Curated annotation (Swiss-Prot):
Pfam families in the record: Asp23 (PF03780)
Superkingdom of the organism of origin: Bacteria
Name assigned to this protein: Uncharacterized protein YqhY
Family under the similarity heading: Belongs to the asp23 family.
Organism this protein belongs to: Bacillus subtilis (strain 168)
């Protein structure tokens, strides 16, 4: 496993030099692509990213783990979905949006994009309106 290495892009025009992409860039691209999908309420990071965000720093790679191995790139995405959506459809849309965005921006192909649904977010405003109507 090469977690701290840079990804070398394969392109035909090598006479100008090489292009390398840091794994953190892949995390940010994947995180933004996942957040764009309808039905994804938020990305879920670990405790450290939560603490950092409380101090005002936005982490666009939150909820994304990139694993660089000899056989290719594996991406794990941890997200919360909106209540009422079809989880398989949202997960498939997240996978496709990440794959397409990374391919367009970096020309890198990904071995696996694993989606982990770690929570469901309820629409509290709709619940409040419903409670007010009942009273």
């Amino acid at each position: 496993m090469k977690d701290n290495s840079l990804l070398k892009m394969d392109h035909e025009d090598t006479h100008l030099g090489k292009v390398e992409i840091a794994p953190e860039v892949i995390e940010v691209i994947a995180g933004i692509a996942a957040s764009e999908v309808d039905g994804v309420a938020e990305m879920r990071g670990n405790f450290a990213t939560g603490v950092v965000e409380r101090f005002g720093k936005v982490n666009h790679g939150k909820g994304v783990k990139v694993d660089l191995a000899d056989d290719g790139i594996t991406i794990d995405v941890y997200c919360v979905v909106t209540f009422g959506v079809s989880i398989p459809k949202v997960a498939a849309s997240v996978q496709e949006n990440i794959r397409q965005t990374l391919l367009n921006m970096t020309s890198l192909s990904i071995n696996e994009i694993n989606i982990h649904i770690v929570g469901i977010q309820f629409d509290t405003k709709a619940q409040e309106v419903q409670i007010d109507e009942e009273m």
